[in-house]
Amino acid sequence: MASLNPFDLLGDDAEDPSQLAVALSQKVEKAAAAVQPPKAAKFPTKPAPPSQAVRESRNAPQGGRGGTGGRGGFSRGRGNGGYNRDNRNNDAPGNENGFSGGYRRPSEDADGASRGGSVGGYRVGGGREGPRRGGVANGESGDVERPPRNYDRHSRTGHGTGMKRNGGGRGNWGTTEDDIPPTSEEPTTEVEKSPVAEKQGGEDETPEAKKELTAEEKAQKEAEEAEAREMTLEEYEKILEEKKKALQATKVEERKVDTKVFESMQQLSNKKNTDEEIFIKLGSDKEKRKDATEKAKKSLSINEFLKPADGKRYNGRGGGSRGRGGRGGRGEGGNQRYAKEAAAPAIGDTAQFPSLG
């Protein structure tokens, strides 16, 4: 790719702008003259006769995969002399077998065995190895199958016989919005009631009149309540006496004692103080249980809890040392361990418990 000079336009200042305008106008005139008027539409030509179309299909170059007959089966247009739309009504022998459209006619000099066999002059078997779709090789007659469909190469498993619905969604089933019918606003038949008609049919009272009535009613109620509250002194005293009697009755009821509780009691005499009488309730198990629990409790000193666990062993000073003079010196038996019971700390010792001193 050729490189452009970015500084090429810097030297264009010397040109006359009027000359540039004239040059542009000339270019526009030439372009208008070059435009040609549209040609008249051509009428369709007469189609060629069937015999000529068959000859042209024979002389045409051979196709791609299938050779003379397409992939070894019925020719679909890929091979030489495939299905031709112009030869639908021709006199080819293929129409005698009931197939619509012209199929490739086998060449006269070709051998049927080398082409995999033919049925009624038409290729049914495919490939070099033998016939296809139930055809019989070596020119023997057999049942002829229908021609393949246009979409025969696509797998039809999992597809129903129904037509596809236009639209998106899974499996071309459309979207949820398609099933919802469009809502059309229907004119309402209800007639709005005018406020004037309501006033005529109802009461003619205004809100001011209602307020006045309510004020009068309130005044009457207050007067009746005031009359009910008024009473004489005697009536007031009677009310107070009734209240006092009710209070005294409740107090007396509270002070009453049930004698049923003392039926299981028995009067005994105390040996020490004969003047005092003691009542002991018989058949009470709670006191017996308390006495048993108190007897079970023993007075234990704190020293017993402060002692270490029984059987605990410890090493005294120098227990792990060998001594100074070897085996025969002072350190004889330096490795012996003494099992001693640890003494409990003395509570009175201020060194161990300085806060208690």
Swiss-Prot record:
The modification N-acetylalanine is found at residue 2. Residues 63-82, 114-128, 159-172, 316-334 have a biased composition (Gly residues). InterPro entries: HABP4/SERBP1-like, HABP4_PAIRBP1-bd, STM1-like_N. One of its GO terms (biological process) is regulation of translation. The modification Phosphoserine is found at residue 355. It is found in: Nucleus; Cytoplasm, Perinuclear region. It comes from the Eukaryota. Keywords: Acetylation, Cytoplasm, Nucleus, Phosphoprotein, RNA-binding, Translation regulation. Its main location: nucleus. The keyword RNA-binding applies. Residues 31-45 have a biased composition (Low complexity). GO terms for molecular function: mRNA binding. Residues 239-299 form the FF domain. Residues 25-232, 308-357 are annotated as: Disordered. Residues 143-155, 190-232 have a biased composition (Basic and acidic residues). GO terms for cellular component: nucleus; perinuclear region of cytoplasm; plasma membrane; plastid. Ribosome-binding protein that acts as a regulator of mRNA translation by promoting ribosome inactivation. Binds RNA. Belongs to the SERBP1-HABP4 family. This is RGG repeats nuclear RNA binding protein C. It comes from Arabidopsis thaliana. The gene is RGGC.
